[in-house]
Amino acid sequence: YGAHGVEVQVDKETGKVKILKYVAAHDVGRAINPMLLEGQVYGGTAMGVGYALTERLILEKGEVMNPNFRDYKMLTAKDVIPVEPVIVETIDEAGPFGAKGIGEPGLVPSAPAIANAIYDAIGVRLKELPMTPERVLKAIKEKK
């Protein structure tokens, strides 16, 4: 299980979303290698932030129309936000040594947590990914 809490700042003139604080808590069972677990949380969360804010796959009749990193806006090392990982240990008797999986669970709650933080910041509910500045501005204008 996992839960993410995000605090954002939204520029109402540009639609740009800036993540100010990000906390990611995950129940991992027994934390056999805490440093590795935190790395998985960082990586999964970075992927989720990319999906939430920048990454948009454009398909036309099944063909990828943005097949390069110039047009498909993946986060880079300079874009990754600081994440405060919280490792929760509840021993899972069914798992090896009491551990649970932590493969990509950091990815799953990212977009909803960011969407809720945007709503909390400006009162606009975004329901489509990625939540680009253009989509944020459009939602702000539609709210008025």
Question: Can you say where each PLM-predicted feature lies in the sequence?
Answer:
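C-terminal catalytic domains of large/alpha subunits in multi-subunit enzymes
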Residues: 1-144
